[in-house]
Curated annotation (Swiss-Prot):
Key words of the record: Dioxygenase, Ethylene biosynthesis, Iron, Metal-binding, Oxidoreductase, Plasmid
Protein name: 2-oxoglutarate-dependent ethylene/succinate-forming enzyme
Cofactor names: Fe(2+)
Uppermost EC category: oxidoreductase
Additional record remark: A dual-circuit mechanism has been proposed in P.syringae pv phaseolicola for the complete reaction, in which the binding of L-arginine and 2-oxoglutarate in a Schiff-base structure generates a common intermediate for the two reactions.
A Pfam family hit: DIOX_N
InterPro entries according to UniProt: DIOX_N, IPNS-like_FE2OG_OXY, IPNS-like_sf, Iron_ascorbate_oxido_reductase, Oxoglu/Fe-dep_dioxygenase_dom
Keyword Transit peptide carried by entry: no
Any one GO biological process: ethylene biosynthetic process
Involved pathway(s): Alkene biosynthesis; ethylene biosynthesis via 2-oxoglutarate
Domain Fe2OG dioxygenase: 166-286
GO MF annotation terms: 2-oxoglutarate oxygenase/decarboxylase (ethylene-forming) activity; dioxygenase activity; metal ion binding
Species of the source: Pseudomonas syringae pv. pisi
Function description: Simultaneously catalyzes two reactions, namely formation of ethylene and of succinate from 2-oxoglutarate.
Amino acid sequence: MTNLQTFELPTEVIGSAADISLGRALIQAWQKDGILQIKTDSEQNRKTQEAMAASKQFCKEPLTFKSSCVSDLTYSGYVASGEEVTAGKPDFPEIFTVCKDLPVSDQRVKAGWPCHGPVPWPNNTYQKSMKAFMGELGLAGERLLKLTALGFELPINTFTDLTRNGWHHMRVLRFPPQTSTMSSGIGAHTDYGLLVIAAQDDVGGLYIRPPVEGEKRNRNWLPGESSAGMFEHDDPWTYVTPVQNVWTVFPGDILQFMTCGQLLSTPHKVRLNTRERFACAYFHEPNFEACAYQVFEPSGNERIHYGEHFTSMFMRCYPDRITTKRIHKDNRLAHFK
C-alpha cells in the first residue's frame, strides 16, 4: 500500500513562482506514482456526495427503466453490467455516461456530427447533480493543466487552448459485490483522454500501475498498440485507498502523446469488493474538433484529431450499441474526412 501524494490547488493559476513549483511537483508525482490526490473543499465535497447519492438512487431503478436511458445520437446514457468489454472480457459495472449535453436544435446535432446529442437524463435531480459536480471538476481540470504546462516550462495555456469548450464527460459507475465466480470489475487498461479526475466511496477496489523503469508502455491511440489487458497479472499494482475529501488525478493517453511520453497514461483496473461500490471518473478533454500535438516537437507531423479518436474508442468499446449502429447507418464518420 502506498500513501499517495496530496496537493492543494490554488484558486487561480497565474504563472507565479509558487505555481511553477507546484506544477513541477505534480509532474514528479505522476512520474513516480502514476497518480496523485488533490484536496477538495466543502463545496466540492457537497457536490461529490450529491452526485454519488443520485447515482445510488438511479441504480435502484428497474432495469427496464435504466435501459431506456440511451440514445442513438450520443454515447451518453446507461450501460448495463457486462455490456462493456476490455481485452475480450466483459466488465461488470453499471455505468451512466454523461457527455456534452446538446439539444437537437444545436447546429452540430442537426448536421449529424457523430456522438452529438442530448443526454437521456433519467430525471431532473440526476441531471442537476451531475452537471453541478462536473462543473467543479472542470474548474479543477483547467487549473491542473495550467500547472502542468508551467511545470514543463511551457506557456501556461499550452493544454488549455485545446480544452476550450472541451468534450468533457464523465462515467458514473456502480460495481456489484464480488461473488464466488466474479471478482474482476474492470480489466487493466489506460484511458483514452487527456486528464482523469476521479471520486470514489469508502469501499475501495481501484488499482493503478505506477511507471516502471525500462517497461515498454503501448501507445494506446495507435490501432496496433492497445493497452487493454496489459500487465493484468504482473506486479507492481498500487491499491488506491479511499481517502475522504480528495479526488484522484492521473494522465490519459492524450497527455502521454502530447508530452512525448514524459507523462505516461496510467494503467488501472478494478477488483470487486464484498460490498457494492460507487465511483465517478471525469475526463477533462480537448474540444471535439481540436488536434492534439506533441508539445516538445510542435513542428512534427503527428496529430490526433480528438473527436475522431473519441468516436473510434467508443465505437470499439460498444460495437452493438444503437449509437454505433446509427453512426454506420448515417455514415457519420464522413464528418472526419
